[in-house]
Design a protein with these regions (language model features):
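Beta-strand-rich, non-transmembrane domain signature
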Residues: 21-290, 294, 373-379, 383, ...
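Secondary-structure boundary elements
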Residues: 291-366
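Bacterial Sec-dependent N-terminal signal peptides
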Residues: 1-26
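Sec/Tat-exported extracytoplasmic proteins
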Residues: 164, 342-346, 663-667
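A carboxyl-terminal module marker
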Residues: 516-677
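Secondary-structure capping and boundary motifs in well-ordered enzyme cores
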Residues: 148, 330-334, 363-374, 409
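Extended, non-catalytic structural segments that build the interaction scaffolds
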Residues: 322-328, 473-474, 581-586, 606
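Short coil/turn segments at secondary-structure boundaries
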Residues: 89-93, 171-172, 201-203, 308-320, ...
Length: 677
């Protein structure tokens, strides 16, 4: 059974009536003292910081002066803020789309905060001057406002209208909030037969109301000449069309609980979105589905993306700095010289950005830019040196999945570079200084990505399962030279490349001292670290190696209890919840091998020792192995934890939880040494 469902239907051509009509249980604009009491529900508790009482959206279509239809989107929201942790809800952000001279318009913005003071409801309205606009990129503007007089137990209401001619991109609707429960979430869309949409519904909660009604509307549309100009004001045409009005409601929707090992709530949260599939002029149905071929053509013409790839002169100004950067004549070494010049000298200021916001010359001058700007600059530099290269667009794990079947550019937040040198392809990211040539950060391994190139455009896939991480830990413990001072030992941890990258990044923030202090704290008082270091820390193309020397005190006692896994044991089960609705998404498959060779402490013998064990998970998808043996003088232990894949559906959760629970218990077992008599 799958963990969520995606429904695909053309929504303007069918009717599905499931529930009878039920009115929205909120009277907007009229707040009484009774409204300050939260209605009875099943999704709030003492930890709830705010409750979305009602969130209503509607989209209707209208004729426009561009020869077709646009839409009107209305939203009304009421929220009860319970404590200061939810004050962020008082700031509302609205994204508007713009393309050339055509832009969406925001109107009828109203926002009011209601407080109960001495038994009286006091309303404080937002002033229009408190509405601000920020440009996100060339196609998106963010309008933002903050409601005044917000404090604990305030009720806020806001509403607004968006007018848009971009009928190909009608608003999606999210029924579930990541942080706050919602008592009533409703979306209504009235779609004429002039346009048809594919909609996809995701999430695990069912609709409380799922209703569709046939109707009929007239649309007054201004004629447009072949040149694209509107005709005379009185040259209008009235088009009659059948409609389908859809109403979707979810009731008592819990906040989305973000569990361990889940890439992005966006992939699983309750929502519905739309893609234009066709238009109908009364005689002929015209498929309008966008394609990656068309999207690639547009992006290669876009001066804010990859137009430099098709311009004859390109960015010739790059030849001068390249002459100073590139010294080798070998193409691979040239590519590395360019790559490391960027990683070592440029600062990435945004890791969710695919467009050039200013110019590549500004990026070079200021030595900083977004991930898109830096990797587009890398692509351009490689092309200037006659190295085959192209940008690759993708969606990072935290941004959610994107579709291989059709392009939704808003879901793409990241750009890397594909370079082909000899018979080998390299995927590069020059925005991260601790990342080596030919490697990508873990969050890029999120499935589908698209190469943007006129000659070699294609879908590529970066899957978590393709990352093969091997970690080995070697521990050697011997008696001190005099046989009386205790034990001394060495610990060598050789993580895989991704773990090495993550360690390098954490050391940049906290430093090596903090790292080794944490190792010392985890080891306890009986073990003292005497020396420590990290090999290959400055070599981003290879994994690191952590080396530690230590002494262990053997107290004047008849019994020693020894935990044979010094570091790296699993202290707690990462899957503590008894029930899980969503899949488990590990960053990559794991294969960890811990090996201990230990002399029996002088004057002691082994009294008790853990038993050997081997446990398999899901018919070979993973296994845990605990092998231990002893002689009179020596103990040898080998512990292996292996997971061959990174993704597990919800139906595997219980067995996964039991598997890791067993590992935690087994790795906590001790060896007992008894003094010789």
């Amino acid at each position: 059974m799958r963990f969520f469902f995606t429904t695909l239907l053309i929504v303007s051509l069918s009717v599905n009536c499931v529930f009878a009509q039920q009115k929205t249980p909120v009277n907007f604009g009229k707040i009484t003292t009774a409204d300050f009491a939260i209605p009875s529900n099943t999704v709030t508790d003492s930890s709830t910081a705010a409750v979305i009482i009602a969130d209503l959206g509607s989209t209707t279509f209208k004729g426009n002066d561009k020869g077709w239809v646009g839409y009107i989107f209305n939203r009304k929201t009421r929220i009860k803020i319970l404590n200061k942790k939810a004050f962020e809800l008082a700031t509302v952000k609205i994204h508007l789309y713009t393309e050339d001279d055509n832009r969406e318009k925001l109107e009828n913005v109203a926002a009011t905060a209601y407080n109960l003071e001495n038994g009286t409801v006091v309303a404080t309205k937002m002033e229009k001057r408190d509405l601000f606009a920020d440009r996100i990129d060339k196609n998106r503007v963010e309008q933002k406002f903050t409601l005044p007089a917000v404090k604990e137990n305030t009720i806020i209401e806001y509403s607004y209208t968006v007018y848009s001619d971009f009928y190909f991109n009608i608003p999606e609707w999210t029924f579930q909030n990541i942080d706050y429960p919602c008592l009533w979430s409703e979306y209504e869309v009235n779609i004429p037969s002039l346009v048809g949409y594919i909609f996809s519904k995701r999430g695990v909660h069912p609709f409380y109301i799922d209703k569709a009604d046939d109707g009929h509307e007239n649309y007054l549309i201004k004629r447009v000449t072949d040149g694209g100009r509107g005709a005379a004001d009185n040259d209008m045409m009235s088009i009659s069309a059948t409609t389908v009005k859809h109403r979707w409601v979810m009731k008592d929707v819990p906040a989305f609980y973000v569990e361990n090992y889940l890439f992005s709530p966006e992939n699983y949260i309750d929502k519905i979105d739309f893609q234009l599939a066709q238009t109908y002029n009364g005689e002929t149905v015209h498929p309008v589905k966008n394609t990656w071929t068309k999207a690639t053509e547009d992006m290669l013409k876009d001066k804010d993306f990859a137009a430099f790839m098709t311009e004859q002169d390109g960015n010739r100004w790059l030849d001068k700095p390249l002459a100073a950067i590139v010294k080798s004549t070998d193409p691979l070494q040239q590519a590395k010289e360019i790559f490391y010049y960027l990683t070592n000298n440029f600062t990435c200021i945004s890791y969710h950005n695919k467009y050039i916001k200013t110019t590549l010359q500004d990026v070079v001058k200021n030595r900083k830019g977004g991930v898109g700007e830096i990797n587009l600059l890398l692509t351009d530099m490689l092309l200037r040196k006659q190295i085959t290269a192209a940008p690759v667009v993708l969606s990072t794990r935290e941004y959610g999945y994107n579709y291989a079947s059709y392009p939704l550019l808003d879901r793409l937040d990241y750009v890397i570079c594909k370079a082909t040198i000899g018979n080998r392809e390299y995927y590069l990211d020059a925005s991260r200084p601790r990342l080596g040539f030919g490697h990508l950060p873990p969050n890029c391994y999120n499935g589908h990505a698209r190469v943007i190139d006129m000659q070699d455009s294609a879908s590529v896939y970066f899957l978590a399962d393709s990352l093969k991480e091997l970690q080995t830990i070697l521990v050697n413990i011997v008696n001190d030279a005099d046989g009386k001072s205790g034990l001394r030992g060495s610990y060598t941890n050789s993580p895989g490349y991704m773990d090495s990258y993550l360690l390098r990044a954490s050391l940049d923030e906290a430093g090596q001292k903090k790292y080794f202090d944490n190792l010392q704290a985890a080891a306890g008082d009986e073990l003292q670290i005497t020396e420590a270091g990290i090999d290959s820390l400055k070599d981003p193309e290879n994994p690191v190696k952590v080396n530690v020397g230590f002494n262990i005190k053997t107290a004047a006692t008849d019994i020693i209890y020894f935990s044979p896994i010094l570091w790296g044991d699993m202290k707690t089960n990462p899957f503590s919840a008894t029930v899980r609705k969503y899949p488990v998404e590990m960053p990559f498959p794991i294969h960890q091998v811990y090996t201990l060779t230990m002399e029996t402490p002088a004057g002691f013998v082994v009294d008790e020792m853990p038993k050997q064990a081997r446990v398999s998970f899901n018919d070979g998808e993973g296994y845990f192995e605990y092998l231990i043996q002893k002689t009179e003088e020596l103990i040898q232990l080998r512990v292996t934890v292996s997971m061959k894949k990174a993704y597990f559906p919800p139906e595997d959760y219980n067995s996964l939880r039991e598997f890791f629970g067993y590992i935690v218990k087994k790795e906590s077992e001790q060896i007992v040494f008894k003094k010789k008599h």
